[in-house]
């Protein structure tokens, strides 16, 4: 009887206190990710998705022609920083809390990781991504106007014009596609990373919950999960097309996710839906290493330094 009681006690999932330092940690991690390799990969990926006739090398050359090395960091300050600081905090906090809730319901690490990531991704999209993706579109429009010889408007002027003409719906254009992208992104990344992590534990014999993976094992699991999550590239191409300001007389009006999918498939076939998948895989690996791999290690570091227990492990 005592052994049964001890086993039950060992299996109890403790409720971790919500830590403000953990929310700030999410913002700092994403800011670090986007300021290093994240933004260059994002710019190349978006260029390929918007110009589906470009190869990877043509996209790299095109971006370089728009400002050299600085061309790869267009939109970083302030728009990508605003997006990174808000979406990182939301993702890390919400997904951690959701994963704890799902584990409390009896779900295993893999299922809890997927559902925690999905919950964090959807919340991320509707809470922060509408404004941020609008600002990115404004930045792209400003550069296109300048390169075409027109008088470039300020970002805020274009933003005001969009809001004046289309209202809230205009500045949140494509938000449903963003929500689908985010929930499949982070559901895949957290779930696959946890699945790989469980496999590593079995191979290395670290089956006890108190056994820690070393940094290389943790980053390897995170990177593999991030790379595999690029399976949903079609929804990313759809998102770019819905928010693109590129003039195209053939593009249908009042685009929905379904209409955009049909248009891209008819225009460019299946290859068009996967345009930009190479930099996307690189971006997925880079983002996941930061948010999942370094995130877990950084939370443990914060706990040692501040005495606050991190919310949960993703």
Curated annotation (Swiss-Prot):
One of its GO terms (biological process) is tricarboxylic acid transport. Keywords: DNA-binding, Membrane, Mitochondrion, Mitochondrion inner membrane, Mitochondrion nucleoid, Repeat, Transmembrane, Transmembrane helix, Transport. One of its GO terms (molecular function) is DNA binding. Its main location: mitochondrion. Residues 246-259 bind DNA. GO terms for cellular component: mitochondrial inner membrane; mitochondrial nucleoid; mitochondrion. Disruption phenotype: Shows slow growth and respiration defects in minimal medium. Shows growth defects in acetate-supplemented medium; the phenotype is enhanced by addition of hydrogen peroxide (increased oxidative stress) and/or double knockout of YHM2 and ZWF1. The cytosolic NADPH/NADP(+) ratio is decreased compared to wild type; this effect is enhanced in the presence of hydrogen peroxide. The mitochondrial NADPH/NADP(+) ratio is increased, but only in the presence of hydrogen peroxide. Levels of cytosolic citrate are reduced, but only in the presence of hydrogen peroxide. It comes from the Eukaryota. InterPro entries: Mito_Cit/Oxoglu_Carrier, Mitochondrial_sb/sol_carrier, Mt_carrier_dom_sf. The keyword Repeat applies. It is found in: Mitochondrion inner membrane; Mitochondrion matrix, Mitochondrion nucleoid. It is a multi-pass membrane protein. Mitochondrial antiporter which catalyzes the transport of citrate and oxoglutarate across the membrane. Also shows specificity for oxaloacetate, and to a lesser extent succinate and fumarate. Transports isocitrate, cis-aconitate and L-malate with very low efficiency. Does not show uniporter activity. Helps to maintain normal citrate levels and NADPH/NADP(+) ratios under conditions of oxidative stress. In addition, associates with the mitochondrial nucleoid and binds DNA in vitro, although the relevance of these data in vivo is unclear. Belongs to the mitochondrial carrier (TC 2.A.29) family. This is Citrate/oxoglutarate carrier protein. The lineage of its organism: Eukaryota, Fungi, Dikarya, Ascomycota, Saccharomycotina. The gene is YHM2.
